[in-house]
Amino acid sequence: GMDRSNISFIRNSQDENAAILYSLENGTWRADRDYQNDAFVLHGGGGMKSTLGDMLKYAVMYLNEGVAGNGNRIVERYAVQEMEKPRQFMKPGIYYGYGLETKQVGDRAVYEHGGSLPGVSSNFSFCPQEEVGIVVLCNTMDVSVAAIADAALNAYCGLEVEEERQIHAERSWSAEELEELAGSYVSGEGDAFTLTVENGTLSMKVNGNPTALQAVYPWQGMVRKTYSDIYLTAIRDEEGHVFAARYGSRIFPKEV
């Protein structure tokens, strides 16, 4: 079984065999085993702590459509298939299922889930067609573990390790987009960003930090990171008014 996996906070903080977590706070790096730091955001999803060995067992279960490596069925095949179905748009080419993101790598279907907290960056993915699972666990915050996982999968599949980045035609925000999108947005986890109109375009700050936002499609912008892109997509009501925005994998309600 997955003997080193649990949903505790204090247990891991007291475990000398648990990873030391490295996080950047107010410009200073800290190193500790504070597994409760900002951990309240995980309560809805269980807050699983695990190891590489246990997560590989987890990957085997998905690759076997619900059957563990020892032959025991953990969940029904139907349940795994329902988790993998694309249901909610996240960004171009990537959708959420139930607890899993789904995307294409070439003509291959890939399913994954990532996570981050102070001192933690993680990504879990698997590709049934290639019969491979990839787990990247890092005890440092804000590491591009998804890009590492994608590069590893590409290498395994014999593809170019570094994916070609999407190039968008130059586009300007319309007057309606500028008016509707401008404002402050706060997620339920405490992250926030602001959009202000400056010189005929939108200026963005994420948690107070200036962030370059490019208009790419109607009601959609993109932030180009070093190894990946984050899309911002307006969420509008039936009258066309923006009441929230999807940024990355989170929905940020717009403050009134």
What do the predicted segments below correspond to?
Residues G1-P118, S122:
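Short, surface-exposed loop or secondary-structure junction motifs
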Residues Y22, L100-T102, F124-F126, T194-L195, ...:
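A structural signal for short hydrophobic beta-strand segments in well-ordered beta-sheet cores
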Residues Q36-D38, P128-V132, V161-E162:
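Short acidic (Asp/Glu) and glycine-rich catalytic loops that position anionic groups and cofactors
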Residues V105, C127-Q129, E198:
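Structural motif
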Residues R108, A146-V256:
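Peripheral terminal and inter-domain segments
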Residues N123-T140, V242-R246:
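Short, well-ordered beta-strand elements
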Residues V143:
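Extended, alpha-helix-rich binding/interface surfaces that flank or overlap catalytic cores
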